[in-house]
From Swiss-Prot:
InterPro entries: ARM-like, ARM-type_fold, PUM-HD, Pumilio_RNA-bd, Pumilio_RNA-bd_rpt. It is found in: Plastid, Chloroplast; Cytoplasm. Keywords: Chloroplast, Cytoplasm, Plastid, Repeat, RNA-binding, Transit peptide, Translation regulation. The pumilio repeats mediate the association with RNA by packing together to form a right-handed superhelix that approximates a half donut. The number as well as the specific sequence of the repeats determine the specificity for target mRNAs. SUPFAM superfamilies: ARM repeat (SSF48371). This is Putative pumilio homolog 7, chloroplastic. GO terms for molecular function: mRNA binding.
Length: 650
């Protein structure tokens, strides 16, 4: 920009004409062969404001910058060679006297040409760019699907190999389409690129005949027909040039003109979406939209509904063309690939679509190919969704066969349940099993690993699903194990939650055993970060025998428990739900020699507030009588809650 500003200032001086790149001898210090064609127009054809926008203008006559003598010469072609490196220091500036010898410059140009407007012959190309060509013929239809271009999908010139997400150009998944057996597109590469080769020859780079040396595009003049498939990797590729068909072209790019003949595609030309990397979501019309990244499991959603929501219209010579999803291919085409498809992000969705829309024969083909890989697919990031779907739609005999394979080896079902993906399938298995044989096999497989399952982040959900879906009798093995390992389970992060579920779903003797075991260990559990929840749960049940046993365990320890973070919650729960515990708790609190320490304790102050709210009559008065002498502590961060409320006036 600085060079152009300096050039502009020079052009305003009549004594120093503007030096264009062609006037600088330093520009041609390298071994270059120059062959350029330019069109020249008089400066008088342009206004002062447009002289630099349309070309380079340099008047020498200050009185009339627009006047110029007529041009009567022809530009000679010269070859300039030099061993010195190319220098651009004098691109626009050169001494006028040294540059002009006998009225000519280094290139042999007459001085009168300095006042001419020099510009490239781009007007015809601009007209060519501005002209919009409509599609002469629609894309051919096949027996399988309408293969009409969608304006939302761009057939870009880039090649996307499997390492780039499993896509080739055009947005189609790599490997999804096999090259058609008979296909041809009689299309001139020149019309693909939108440029005339004869014009392109006129625009060679000034430094040589290599059009790409300084970034100019190259266009081939080959008129040979092209195929929409190039070794199964490129769709509508222009083999002779850099430009390809784009469903949407910006205003500055030429539109496409093409014809198609003898193009046919059958269902046998379809390959499944597998054996490719699947990090990049599909953008072709063959994929089904999902609302979230986790929605790999298609729960009974018909593909007809999705197809109706993805219609699109585009103008083709004024005729609307409908674009829709292709129909499902014949299962014979994907037979032998189902196992690999099940482990693919898009393949598992495709197979789920077959379950929704296909026949029982199609489901049988899928089942027969995955039954030998049940364990692996259950723990696969994508295969687990297919297994969940299969458990929903399969027959009882098929479900029994799945259970037999999953429980064939000892500890195998436990290992699946501990897996982040496998736990989903095992939970779905528990939901769908009906026969006694299926339930018995699952129970026998889970029983040895009960303690590991109940403590695991993933495995504990399998136990909870058993409690929800199986009968009380079938869950007896869970209740017995929970009673046996009650303390160990109650003091675990995940186990304490499952233990509460066990109490909620158990009946009669099993429930009594669990509650009795918690009550006997209430003092220990009350001080545990997780065990205190089990004690609070039993207190809220208000079972007299359990409460009596628990209060006997806690008697004499209320002051100590009130000053601890976790057990203080349990003491508050006793004051709220166990009226028989209130006198004992209040007596122990007021008998403390240094009661002011309880008032200022970060946890005990909550117990005192709960005692003031829960007690009445003489019991409440005895507590207030101990609190009033310490009113000086009302500004204490913990005590002010006691004195600021109306608890003392109750």
């Amino acid at each position: 920009m600085d060079e152009f500003r300096e050039a502009s200032s020079v052009s305003s001086s009549p004594s120093t004409p503007l030096r264009t790149p062609l006037h600088s001898p330093n520009l041609f210090n390298g071994d270059f062969s120059v062959s350029n064609r330019f069109s020249f127009k008089s400066s008088s054809d342009y206004s002062l404001s447009s002289s630099f926008s349309n070309g380079l203008c340099s008047p020498e006559d200050s009185s009339s910058p627009f006047s110029s003598p007529p041009f009567n010469g022809i530009i000679p072609k010269h070859n300039h060679t030099s061993s010195s490196p190319v220098s651009f220091d004098s691109l626009f500036f050169k001494d006028h006297e040294k540059s002009h010898v006998n009225g000519t410059d280094d290139l042999g140009l007459c001085e009168d040409l300095y006042r001419m407007n020099i510009k490239e012959d781009v007007e015809e190309d601009q007209i060519r760019y501005a002209r919009t060509e409509t599609l002469k013929d629609p894309l051919p239809k096949s027996d399988h699907t309408d293969f009409t271009p969608d304006p939302l999908y761009n057939f870009s010139p880039k090649h996307y190999e499997p390492s780039n997400g499993g896509f080739v150009s055009g947005g189609f998944p790599y490997g999804f389409f096999r090259p058609p057996k008979e296909s041809s597109i009689n299309q001139s590469c020149a019309s693909w690129s939108g440029f005339d080769q004869s014009k392109n020859d006129d625009k060679r780079n000034m430094f040589g005949n290599n059009p790409q040396q300084f970034g100019w595009p190259s266009y081939s003049s080959s008129n040979s027909g092209t195929s929409p498939y190039n070794n199964g990797q490129e769709i509508f590729e222009n083999r002779g040039g850099m430009r390809e068909y784009s469903a949407y072209s910006p205003p500055h790019q030429p539109e496409v003109s093409y014809k198609h003949q003898n193009y046919r595609t059958t269902t046998s030309d379809i390959l499944p979406l597998f054996c490719q990397r699947t990090q990049v979501p599909m953008v072709s019309k063959c994929s089904e939209p999902f609302s979230s990244d986790e929605s790999f499991f298609m729960n009974g959603k018909s593909i007809d509904h999705q197809r109706s929501n993805t219609r699109a219209l585009m103008s083709n010579n004024g005729n609307p063309t409908e674009i829709c999803h292709p129909s499902l291919p014949n299962m014979c085409d994907i037979q032998g690939y189902v196992y690999l498809m099940a482990k693919d992000q898009h393949g598992c969705r495709f197979l789920q679509r077959i379950f929704d829309e296909g026949t029982s024969v199609d489901a049988m083909i899928i089942f027969n190919e995955v039954i030998a890989h049940v364990v692996e697919l259950m723990m696969d990031p994508f295969g687990n969704y297919l297994m969940q779907k299969l458990l929903d739609v399969c027959t009882e005999e098929q479900r029994t066969q799945i259970v037999l394979v999953a429980t064939e080896e000892p500890g195998q079902l436990i290992r699946i349940s501990l897996n982040a993906y496998g736990t989903r399938v095992v939970q779905r298995l528990v939901e769908t099993i009906r026969s006694g044989k299926q339930i018995s096999l699952v129970k026998l497989a889970l029983r040895p690993g009960f303690l590991d399952l109940i403590k695991d982040l993933n495995g504990n959900h399998v136990i909870q699903r058993c409690l929800q879906c199986l009968s009380t009798e079938d869950n007896k093995f869970i209740f017995d194990a929970a009673t046996k390992f009650c303390t160990e389970i109650a003091t675990h992060r995940h186990g304490c939650c499952v233990l509460q579920k066990c109490i909620a779903y158990s009946m009669r003797q099993q429930r009594e055993k669990l509650i009795a075991e918690i009550s006997r260990n209430s003092l220990l559990l009350a001080q545990d970060p997780f065990g205190n929840y089990a004690v609070q749960f039993v207190i809220e049940l208000r079972i007299p025998s359990a409460v009596a046993m628990m209060l006997a365990q806690l008697k004499g320890h209320y002051v100590q428990l009130s000053m601890q973070k976790f057990s203080s919650h349990m003491v508050e729960r006793c004051l709220m739900h166990c009226p028989e515990s209130r006198p004992q708790i209040v007596r122990e609190l007021v008998s403390v020699p240094h009661f002011d320490q309880l008032l200022q304790d970060p946890y005990a102050n909550f117990v005192i507030q709960a005692a003031l709210a829960a007690t009445k009559g003489p019991l409440h008065a005895s507590l207030v009588e101990v609190i009033r002498p310490h009113s000086i502590l009302r500004n204490n961060p913990y005590c002010k809650r006691i004195f600021s409320r109306n608890l003392l006036k109750k």
